[in-house]
Amino acid sequence: MMQIFIAGAVAFLAAVLFTPVLIRKFSDEGLGQEIREEGPKSHLKKRGTPTMGGIAILVGITLGYIVAVLVGLVFTGSGPGVSGWLVLGLTLALGGVGFADDYIKLVKGRNLGLNARAKLICQLVIAIAFGVMILQFPDSNDITPGSTYLSFVREMPTFNIAVGGAVIGMILFLIFINIVISAWSNAVNLTDGLDGLASGVTAIVMGAYVLITFWQFRNSCADGAAAGCYFVRDPLDLAMLASAGLGACLGFLWWNASPAKIFMGDTGSLALGGLVAGLSITSHTELLMIIVGAIFVLETVSVVIQVTYFKTTGKRVFRMAPIHHHFENGGWAETTVVVRFWLLAALAAMTGFGLFYGEWLTATSF
């Protein structure tokens, strides 16, 4: 428990203190966000706002987790779990892709950043590496960080993704991992369109996963098989990482709240999407994350609907997509959209955790 709080506190302090350093540096160098002319007209005044603030989020998450691990080594003698390192690696790797994209846009002056093919290849390589490694490193109970079984609040034994033999099964599993990672990283990226929206929603999702992974730690099958126990490797490390993500997002939100002094850029949004995906995979709650992260899902689905309907009929379903711009163009103030989406995100997170806890109560009542 102590390590979880320390991870969040250190991450918050690191992000809240390092972000203004980035604001000054990027402002001095003129590395400001370009605003698309076809976007909401109210956003044109944001042109030139420093971006790549996701660097501060990554610093916060990394420092928060490492300090918490060191505290565990000193006070409890317990070393870090491999699951935490793998998810942190995924987060940093996708953050690196986002940084390259931001850097090319801002420093090299190429408006579109990395081309779609290069970005896709980078994400593909990272996801494959992550997918392969999470099936390695079994602990003393033969539990690996990942599982080939599809999961809701825990593994579903009747839904094995890796069917059809070792080779075909591995290919199917890696395709699934690629879909999960790509979906969440792009979903957070789409959500990052209003001041404080993506950082606030991600903080709420991370808060839910602090509770979920801590409960898995308290009821781990590694401590002895019992009714309702969870076959999750290193749940305490996952809780520490979720707490670090929560703290880093809140620290960044201090400066990213309207009117934003800095944007996270693709550096932050792709990294946070990786963190969301990694936590859902290693905690064996991929389908539950769809509920907990419902705002991210809503934003993505709105874009899919808009693009599909427009290509089919030449007409639009929404005034503008993602859907937060639909409400903004409908007369809602930007802060109103953000706060209401935060409230919906909190409702989704509570619903998801309620389902998670309710299943545990059911599993332990027989």
Curated annotation (Swiss-Prot):
Localization = Cell membrane
Can you state which reaction this protein catalyses?
Answer: UDP-N-acetyl-alpha-D-muramoyl-L-alanyl-gamma-D-glutamyl-meso-2,6-diaminopimeloyl-D-alanyl-D-alanine + di-trans,octa-cis-undecaprenyl phosphate = di-trans,octa-cis-undecaprenyl diphospho-N-acetyl-alpha-D-muramoyl-L-alanyl-D-glutamyl-meso-2,6-diaminopimeloyl-D-alanyl-D-alanine + UMP
Q: What would be one Gene Ontology cellular-component term for the protein?
A: plasma membrane
Per the record, the pathway is: Cell wall biogenesis; peptidoglycan biosynthesis
Membrane topology label: Multi-pass membrane protein
What sections of the protein cross the membrane? 3-23, 55-75, 80-100, 118-138, 161-181, 197-217, 235-255, 262-282, 287-307, 341-361
Q: Offer one example of a GO biological process linked to this entry.
A: peptidoglycan biosynthetic process
Q: What is its EC number?
A: 2.7.8.13
Classify the main location.
Answer: membrane
* Cofactors that this protein relies on: Mg(2+)
Gene Ontology molecular function: any one: UDP-N-acetylmuramoyl-L-alanyl-D-glutamyl-meso-2,6-diaminopimelyl-D-alanyl-D-alanine:undecaprenyl-phosphate transferase activity
Q: Which UniProt keywords apply?
A: Cell cycle, Cell division, Cell membrane, Cell shape, Cell wall biogenesis/degradation, Magnesium, Membrane, Metal-binding, Peptidoglycan synthesis, Transferase, Transmembrane, Transmembrane helix
Task: Report the top EC class in one word.
Answer: transferase
Do you know which InterPro entries this protein is assigned to? Glycosyl_transferase_4 (IPR000715), PNAcMuramoyl-5peptid_Trfase (IPR003524), PNAcMuramoyl-5peptid_Trfase_CS (IPR018480)
The answer on whether this UniProt entry bears the keyword Cytoplasm reads no
Q: Does the keyword Nucleus apply?
A: no
Described function: Catalyzes the initial step of the lipid cycle reactions in the biosynthesis of the cell wall peptidoglycan: transfers peptidoglycan precursor phospho-MurNAc-pentapeptide from UDP-MurNAc-pentapeptide onto the lipid carrier undecaprenyl phosphate, yielding undecaprenyl-pyrophosphoryl-MurNAc-pentapeptide, known as lipid I.
What the record says about family reads: Belongs to the glycosyltransferase 4 family. MraY subfamily.
User: Can you say what this protein is called?
Assistant: Phospho-N-acetylmuramoyl-pentapeptide-transferase
| Source organism per UniProt | Corynebacterium urealyticum (strain ATCC 43042 / DSM 7109)
